Swiss-Prot record:
One of its GO terms (cellular component) is cytosol. This is Transcription antitermination protein NusB. GO terms for biological process: DNA-templated transcription termination; transcription antitermination. It comes from Streptococcus pyogenes serotype M1. The gene is nusB. InterPro entries: NusB-like_sf, NusB_fam, NusB_RsmB_TIM44.
Length: 150
């Protein structure tokens, strides 16, 4: 059984978001990644033998390993009076994922990573959140001073 998911980078970013969200809910990294990647691709015993794409694993393990650093970067770009705790889990996860790819994936142009995470945000969050994520990540990409440092 398959659906419209392919192994395109956009689809793998979406799968990475799903895995990271599940990890936040207590799932183990590899199990969350395998589930996010394969839940609608195969059924039964075949589900245990799916080989996960390197890009997907790199995103999930990278965000997981750099979570504290990413959260600190996000916090420095929040407007005065806002805190990381005030953000929804969906928005935090999207920000972490987008920021990680922008910061650590040299082969992906910053604007491409930014636009791709906005597309995922539009699917899993609302328009206001997508604009917020766009603004914060655009500020990071442009090297603008942090909003709460003024």
């Amino acid at each position: 059984m398959t659906n419209s998911f392919q192994n395109s980078r956009r689809d793998l970013r979406e799968r990475a978001f799903q895995a990271l969200f599940n990890i936040e809910m207590g799932a183990e990294l590899l199990a969350a990644s395998q589930f996010a990647y394969g839940y609608d691709k195969v059924t039964g015993e075949d589900a245990q033998v799916l080989e996960l794409p390197i890009f997907l694993l790199s995103l999930v393990t990278g965000v997981n390993n750099h979570k504290e650093e990413l959260d600190n970067l996000i916090s420095t770009h929040l407007k005065k009076g806002w805190s990381l705790e005030r953000l929804t889990l969906t928005d935090k996860t999207l920000l972490r994922l987008g920021l990680f790819e922008i910061k650590y994936f040299d082969e992906t142009p910053d604007r491409v990573a930014l636009n791709e995470i906005i597309e995922v945000a539009k699917k899993y969050s609302d328009e206001t959140s997508a604009k917020f994520i766009n603004g914060l990540l655009s500020q990071y990409v442009s090297g603008a001073p942090s909003a709460n440092k003024s």
